Amino acid sequence: MSFDLESNSSGGSTIGRNSSIRLSSGLAPSESTVSLNEIIDLDREFELLLDKLAIEDPIKRKQMQSLPDISKRTLLEQNKADIYRTVKHKGPIESFADVKSVISSINTKHVPIDIIKTLRIHLNTADRDWIQSFLDNDGVQPILNILKRLERNKNRKRKEHSILQWECTRCIAALMKIKIGMEYIASFPQTTNLMVLCLDTPLIKAKTLVLELLAAIAVTDRGHGAVLTSMIYHKEVKKEITRYFNLVQSLKIEKNAEYLTTCMSFINCIISSPSDLPSRIEIRKAFLNLKILKYIENLRADYNEDKNLLTQLDVFEEELSTDEQLNSQQGTQIGIEDLFSQISSRVTGTPSQQELITLMTHFQRMSSSNLGLGVWTLYNALANQLEDELKIHPDLDVTLVSLLFPEVKKSSSGLFGFGSKSKSPSSSPALSSMAKTELKKDNEEKQKTIEHLLKQLNKFSGGQNTERWMIEREEKNKLIAQLMAQTKNGGGGGGGGVGGDSSLSNDEALKRENQLLRMEIENIKNNPSVLLNSGNSINGDVPNLFISSPGSTLSPSPSGEPPIPSTDFGITSSSIHTSTDKLTNSTEPILGSPPPPPPPPMSGGGGPPPPPPPPGGKSNKPAKPIIKPSVKMRNFNWITIPALKVQGTFWDKLDETSFIQSLDKVELESLFSAKAPTVKVESKQLTRKVVVTVIDMKKANNCAIMLQHFKIPNEQLKKMQIMLDEKHFSQENAIYLLQFAPTKEDIEAIKEYQGDQMQLGAAEQYMLTVMDIPKLDSRLKAFIFKQKFEGLVEDLVPDIKAIKAASLELKKSKRLSDILKFILAIGNYVNGSTTRGGAFGFKVLETLPKMRDARSNDNKLSLLHFLAKTLQDRIPEIWNIGAELPHIEHASEVSLNNIISDSSEIKRSIDLIERDFVPMINDPLFAHDKHWIHKITEFQKIAKVQYQRIEKEIDEMNKAFEEITSYFGEPKSTQPDVFFSTINNFLEDLEKAYGEYQAMIRKAELENSKMEDPEKGGLQDLSSQIRSGQLFKDRRVGDSVIAQMQNVDSLRKNLKSTSTTTPNTPPTIKIELPSQSILKPSGQLKK
């Protein structure tokens, strides 16, 4: 029996749907014979198709190859008829068969967002050949051109620009999903330059995607350098303080956990990608200098339940620790300055920073002690002991570590020896030099406090309230007694040497002091003319005590000085100096410190004599005569050198007396007296111009600043505001001048001023010049509105159309309807055993965000993952839902309040022109300005027509939005941005959940099959490794192995050199590998 095959398909080796089998004998053919020939050709063609579709996952290929033959033939026919390459929805680009026509459609000056969205959808589903052709024909460049234009127009921040930027970035992400696209983008420096500039977008999801793409590029061989260069480019273009500044600051500012995770993963990628250690240290140093460790600590506290973010924070710290360990092994190759710099960068901005400063100060102090350079041997021994301890107990709490020094023997009288008066505790041999220093410092501080209290002791700060004065004196005396006792006893404030006798003597002294104080108060009550003044003496050390007679007045002198006391005293000297005498009697003088200052003089002239020198000190130089000015002078806060320290210096034999005589004392006193001297006719003094301000002072000051900004005469400013020439007068200048247009109150205040107009301030002079311009305020407002009208309309109309179109699209979308039906089915099934089951519908805005929160019992999946899987199985074309809802993303960014505000501004401005200028066309008042009046009224007519159209669009928008909210059962008060953003975010999460589900299945299948995925290096593959931290773990393992191999090679070389120098047969040598401790590697040779 013979037969032949005849195919009507375009491919000769493929049996198509219209192929027929004709038998020469008319009998049925042998089934086995036909199947054999079919299978050979069908399998070959189907393998080629799988390669073309870039299906290289072995699990997926196996599933596809197991399809029935009829399904394989259908797929082959669809591919040959170019059905597969045609977009599955109607859009701006009807077919993607011709790659060049697609590229030319986006290579125009004005590209609609819809075209970019359509391209992005196709890039996500196109086969590898199409994407390769797209790249070969330079299809990326038109996308980059769009990003360039958006960056040039960044000053006009429109929502549609941000969305277009976002869609272009998503197109680049779609290209990077496969390896050839990733390699192409990584080797295209212009792409990364434009991508880093997108980090300034207001859309947080766009910033997150950009950082994810940059992170994936940074871990490729050719991409890391491009990303680093682009970050430098970003610093220059955006005028950053330093590189990475904005990036690190975003860790503090942003609150979106997804963004923070991606940002940290990007930082980890650019730090850890270089293979050489110095490069990683240098890059990380820039981040440490920006105090990133402080922000990481805050993120751990604020997001302690976000596993992905915590993983990236762990990666940063683990990479830091690993590189520090490797760096310590190579420490001899690094300069001491670099080591200090690395340590400083490591702790800057952390709580340990102050501890490091204290430690370095301690090192500096100890290196100058008696130990000298031997101190470093001591510290090295301590560090080695601590390192060994951490090896044995890695979880050791370092705050509980104590160093074991030889125990100090204590005498029976206590450590500080309170029973001995001849020895100071600071000189006790039982104390270390450090303890002596600290004790001496403490005593000095207490002595300063005592001296300060002694100076304040005689100050009468209680006014006429003598009881309050007594309380203050008691408290000060008590504190002085305690401090002097502590200083005498060693400053410990306790200890074994403090007995009860000392406390008893202090109590008795205080009782005696109180009795004397009461006697002094009674004396003051009986003689109320006593005045204790708190002013200082000439030398500023001892308070002056002024006493007046009963018949004298207490009013101050005209110069502001205290009244000159009389010689008729009403109080004895013994009662005046009770406090000072009592303190000197109740406590013993301290060796090496001066006694309390002497009492103040009983007369008003001169100051007290200088205090006596300290015991054992040199005598002072003779006191210089005090030259008292005729008026009270201002203070000159210079720092004088004590007389004891002048000897042997430049000042020792210097006599300035002759210079004082040559000074112009009159001029010196007139310039630096405490109060300005009265103006005299004969004095040479510059006359100052009197400036009169009649308007609000704050407004006048701001107006003066504004005039300095323009730096042109008032008449020229007036002319500019009359002409209002758009070529020479900008909108910004008009806004500036509008703030200082003279109001009705300003004009009245200036007109009421009857003085010399030349004495008016700069602000009044300006307003005097321009206030005769009719309706100046309205003119400037009309000019500003005319300048910004076009931008207002360009921003307003697309927003109105987006809400209207998105409302209609949601109502017509069949795919969205199918999704909501499946959600209703799943919800009723899950809640079937509860009162929430059997629902007829659900609140969309409240339910959709909860889909991801409903977790499976193993906490790995959510209802959103299950929904995505179900939709893929039942309605695989559901993922083209974006084609049905092209305006929902734009609508999600629109604020209804902004639409109302902008439209109201247009309405107010049109009414203002119509009210103030349209009736003035024939007004003689505006005869000199007829040209501008004509221009502004003509503009008003055009603007009014456009506004009427906008009003109509707003009415239609409101009607469409009310219908869609009612259609889904949502309240009418719902805001459009809330409504559309909820649905848009849900659809994006749904698509993302499907990708996560596929990745989990793929990972499980690969683990079970023990097969390696041949297609690595795509965006999803790299992002998954980055997020899980596996990419960094693999690198650390590699670095550790390399380091061990290098150490072993070094040991072998040392061993070889040793063996060659020894003439005898070398003994057997056992090599021990270096320790894995992160603190102290201990590679050794054992014989």
UniProtKB/Swiss-Prot annotation:
Biased composition (Polar residues): 1-23, 569-588
Cellular compartments annotated: Cytoplasm, Cell cortex; Cytoplasm, Cytoskeleton
Organism: Dictyostelium discoideum (Social amoeba)
Comp. bias regions, Low complexity: 416-436, 549-558
Lineage: Eukaryota, Amoebozoa, Evosea, Eumycetozoa, Dictyostelia
Protein name: Formin-H
Domain notes: The DAD domain regulates activation via by an autoinhibitory interaction with the GBD/FH3 domain. This autoinhibition is released upon competitive binding of an activated GTPase. The release of DAD allows the FH2 domain to then nucleate and elongate nonbranched actin filaments.
One annotated GO biological process: sorocarp development
Broad class of the protein's primary localization: cytoplasm
Residue ranges annotated for the DAD domain, each copy included: 1013-1051
Keywords: Actin-binding, Coiled coil, Cytoplasm, Cytoskeleton
Function, as annotated: Formins play an important role in the nucleation of actin and the formation of linear actin filaments. Important for cell migration and formation, elongation and maintenance of filopodia. Specifically controls filopodial dynamics by regulating actin turnover at the barbed ends of actin filaments.
